[in-house]
Structure formats: C-alpha cells, structure tokens
C-alpha cells in the first residue's frame, strides 16, 4: 500500500478502499500503510512546494501538536473558561511545540461521493528561545519513539510571539501557518483549545489577554470554521469514549460495516512517493480488527475510559482499543436486549384484563396503574437514563474528566498502547492500531479521518452557502464542561492589535 515507485516520478495516488482498510479478491484483509512525510530542517525547503500545494488544494486540514509540557494541571481544568484560557496561555508562553502534524484531505468527487486524497506531514521543530520541558513529557515521548537528539540536530527553527521584521516571504514554520490562514480552509483539531493557543503563540503573535479577544481573532483567522473531533465524537456521534484513538478506531470499524453493507462510506487514497523520498517517509500501519479476538487479560478500566493509564506499558491489563470497543458494543447490545425484554413485559402487563394503556377507563374516573406495571416502567426509565448517562461526557469521571486537558503534553489520547513490547507483561501479544511511535502527523491523520467519517454519517448535506457541518462548526471541546467553547466574535470583543497587523500582512494593506 502506498509503496515507493522506482522511477522518481511525481507521486501518484494509491487507493485504500473503505477508508484505511482494503480487501483482496479472496476476502483477506490487507494491512494498509499510511505514509507520513517527515519534514525536518534538512528537507524543509525541498518539501515546501508540496506542503503549500497540499494545504491550498485541501478541502480541510487537520492539525495536531506535540508539546514540551503544560504546567499546572488543575488550572487547565478550571470551571471558569476565562481562567482556564489564562492557564493555557501561561503554558504556551513558557513551553514550546516540539512537532507539528498536518493532514490535508482533498475531495475526489470523480472517484466517489466520499473519496479523499490524504497527504500527511510530520514537522520536527526547534524553538530558538528558552522554554520549559517537563520530565513527564520527555518520558512519554521517548517511550513512543520521539528522538530528541534528532530534534535538536534537525528541528526546523522558529521563534515565538510577534514577527521580527517582514517574514512573509521566508520559508519558515511561521510563514507556513500564515499560508494555512490564507488558504481559508476548515481547521480540524481534537480537544483543540490547547492546540489553538499554542499555535497562536508559537507561529502567529503574542496571545491576547482575554478569551473573547482570542476567539474574535480565531474567527477572522479561520473564516471557514474550526472543528473539534472530540466534540463531534462525544456530542454528536455519542461514542462511549472520545479520546482520539478510540474515536478513530470506532469510525474505522463503523465505516467498514457501511462499506460491507453497500452503504455510503469513506474511501481514501494516499500518494505513491518516489524512491528518492524513502528516507523521509514513515509508514504507519492500520490493522483490520481481528475476527476472533483472544481475551488473555481483563481490560484496563482507566485506559478504557480516558485513553491513558498511569502504569503505562507496565500495566498487566489490556490496552487493546479493539477489545475495548468490542466490550463497549457488547455491553450496549446487552442493554438494548434487556430494554426490549422489559418493554415487552410492560406491554404484556398493560394488556392484562382490567388494565388500560392510558390509565383511564372509558366510562369512569382514571384507574391506578397495576403495581407491577409501575415498577417495570421505573426500571425501564432507569435503564434508559443509564444508557444516556454513559453516552454523556463521562459524568462518572467527575473532576478528573479525561485527564486529556491536563496531560496533553504527555498525550493521554493514545498513550501507552504498546503493552506487548514490555518483557514480562501480561498484555495481549497482538499489535494494535497506533502501536509504537507516537507521531503528531499520524495523530493529525486520525483527527482528519474522524471528521471525514462524521460527514459521511450525517448523510447528504443540503446545498447552501452555510458552513460545512454546521452542527460542529466553531465548537471547541472543553474538558469537564457540558457546553463547548463557541468561536465567535461578539459585539463586546475586538480583535487584538497584533492580529490586525498579521491580517494586513496576509491580505495586504486593505
């Protein structure tokens, strides 16, 4: 899949039927490899035209970051959105972005209603100013294959805050971010508040002091809209869990079911890169779910709920995402069966002689319900409530909600899945999707895939001049809160001075 061509020709698309799963004629599943282009200082100029072309021709761009830390975790979960914003701002001013992932998705209407060409890039960065790097972040990134020696030797240099002179014509990460703004494409992130704040401070300008000014700036920077796949997975797709790897794998599986049923489904193509680029391509495997999955150990409850476990690869319980989803789906089906049985019993009681479905006789006053009927109704309502609670934003987690916000630097989103690599651990020896290296590029791809699948699952969209996927438009997930952050410019907020200067740089003095 997406193998290198030997003639050095222009990269050609390589198809992946059904998303990131492809079947042979014999029905055997193939492991599909997602090519992630590594971009560093030694090939940044060479890759510059490809980066610009991918961004400018994309229908939407997904972004992910790896950070050097975040600071005080409690402040990042402050129930006051303004105080939470200030805490993230402090982190962005004192920490840095270590790597940037870009996944550009371009529609191919001639190849199907939901066909995309996906181009994925992983940029290794090096902030040229002093910044804090946290030990936990280092441990996590090293555990997932991040090469700090390579980062310091080959990281693309950049500076934070406001521009230093005219940088609009230089080939830099800051100019690349400006080109992303100029492209006016929808921006897709996962649990995106932290990413947005860090992107602004590191590649754009000094952050404004107030959240209202920040969202006003964002509204003008990305007029096509900002989309958060964590919000989409939790509030619209209603997944049991919404951390990135869970959402991605769940969408993969559902997309495979739709493909098998002949229903509308997502298909992807990747570029067939020439052999001259071989040293700069990292192929990430996406495995089909096993038909008969062994159950060697119990599932880690912490990882199942949050996508993160404090024991990491030393955990004796399973972190297998497919096994977690299998268990969730089995539990949901069991609840549906029990609910149907209770509904049948309820109807049988209502149809007994002397009872009325409306609780009211034809020629007399209302009669009391049969005692058993009342109990059955209460049980049914309770079960429905349990189902709804399970699909709400992890109410049982309390103030711990996700830990994602507080540990995004050592991302819990897909943390510590490589359990089979630790000698002596009792985890499943079978590899799972996303195993091994933890890359901002592949995370960006997973983020974009989830958004593309959400579009498929919502069915045909009415032709209008309105925004793409209006239910998710400009809504950014806030951990621990029941409502998202709305990216909008209110009548009480003004854009920041630094932002206005950047807009003049992007669009000219007008």
Swiss-Prot record:
The keyword Acetylation applies. It comes from the Eukaryota. The modification Phosphoserine is found at residues 5, 358, 428. InterPro entries: CAF1_poly(A)_ribonucleases (IPR051181), RNase_CAF1 (IPR006941), RNaseH-like_sf (IPR012337), RNaseH_sf (IPR036397), Znf_CCCH (IPR000571). The modification N-acetylalanine is found at residue 2. It is found in: Nucleus, Nucleolus; Nucleus speckle. This is Target of EGR1 protein 1. A motif (Nuclear localization signal) lies at residues 335-347. Interacts with U1, U2, U4, U5 and U6 snRNAs. One of its GO terms (biological process) is snRNA 3'-end processing. Inhibits cell growth rate and cell cycle. Induces CDKN1A expression as well as TGF-beta expression. Mediates the inhibitory growth effect of EGR1. Involved in the maturation of snRNAs and snRNA 3'-tail processing. Keywords: Acetylation, Metal-binding, Nucleus, Phosphoprotein, Zinc, Zinc-finger. Belongs to the CAF1 family. It comes from Pongo abelii (Sumatran orangutan). GO terms for cellular component: Cajal body; nuclear speck; nucleolus. It holds the Pfam family zf-CCCH. Residues 1-23, 332-400, 491-510 are annotated as: Disordered. One of its GO terms (molecular function) is poly(A)-specific ribonuclease activity.
């Amino acid at each position: 899949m997406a193998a290198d061509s030997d003639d050095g020709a222009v990269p050609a698309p390589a198809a992946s039927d059904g998303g990131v799963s492809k079947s042979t004629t014999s029905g055997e599943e193939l492991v599909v490899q997602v090519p992630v282009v590594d971009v560093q200082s030694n090939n940044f100029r060479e890759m510059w035209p490809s980066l610009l072309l991918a961004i400018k021709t994309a229908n939407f761009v997904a972004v992910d970051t790896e950070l050097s830390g975040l600071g005080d975790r409690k402040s990042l979960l402050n129930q006051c959105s303004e105080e939470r914003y200030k805490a993230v701002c402090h982190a962005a001013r004192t920490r840095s972005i270590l790597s940037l992932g870009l996944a550009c998705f371009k529609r191919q209407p001639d190849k199907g209603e939901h066909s995309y060409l996906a181009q994925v890039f992983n940029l290794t960065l090096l902030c040229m100013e002093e910044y804090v790097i946290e030990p936990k972040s280092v441990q996590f990134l090293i555990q997932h294959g991040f090469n700090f020696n390579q980062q310091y030797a080959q990281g693309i240099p950049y500076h934070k805050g406001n521009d230093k002179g005219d940088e609009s014509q230089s080939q830099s990460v800051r100019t690349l971010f400006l080109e992303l703004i100029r492209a006016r494409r929808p921006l897709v992130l996962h649990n995106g508040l932290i990413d947005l704040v860090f992107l602004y401070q590191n590649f754009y300008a000094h952050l404004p002091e107030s959240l209202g000014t920040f969202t006003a700036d964002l509204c003008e920077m990305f007029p096509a809209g900002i989309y958060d796949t964590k919000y989409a997975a939790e509030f619209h797709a209603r997944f049991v869990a919404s951390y990135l790897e869970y959402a991605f794998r769940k969408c993969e599986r559902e997309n495979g079911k739709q493909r098998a049923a002949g229903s509308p489904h997502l298909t992807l193509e990747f570029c067939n890169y020439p052999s001259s680029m071989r040293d700069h391509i990292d192929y990430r495997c996406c495995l089909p779910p096993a038909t008969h999955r062994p159950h060697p150990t119990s599932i880690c409850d912490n990882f199942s709920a949050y996508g993160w476990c404090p024991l990491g690869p030393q955990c004796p319980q399973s972190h297998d995402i497919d096994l977690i989803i299998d268990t969730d789906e089995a539990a949901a089906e069991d609840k549906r069966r029990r609910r149907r049985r209770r509904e049948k019993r309820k109807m049988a009681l209502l149809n007994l002689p002397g009872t009325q479905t409306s609780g009211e006789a034809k020629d007399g006053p209302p009669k009391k319900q049969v005692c058993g009927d009342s109990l059955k109704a209460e049980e049914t309502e309770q079960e429905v409530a349990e189902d709804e609670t399970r699909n709400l934003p992890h109410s049982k987690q309390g103030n711990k909600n996700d830990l994602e916000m507080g540990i995004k630097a050592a991302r819990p989103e897909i943390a510590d899945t490589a359990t089979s690599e630790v000698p002596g651990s009792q985890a499943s020896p079978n590899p799972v999707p996303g195993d091994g290296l933890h890359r901002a590029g592949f995370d960006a791809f997973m983020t974009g895939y989830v958004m593309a699948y959400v579009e498929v699952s919502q069915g045909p969209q009415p032709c209008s001049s309105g925004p793409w996927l209006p239910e998710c438009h400009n809504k950014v997930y806030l951990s621990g809160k029941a409502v998202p952050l709305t990216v909008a410019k209110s009548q009480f907020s003004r854009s920041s001075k630094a932002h206005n200067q950047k807009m003049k740089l992007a669009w000219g003095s007008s």
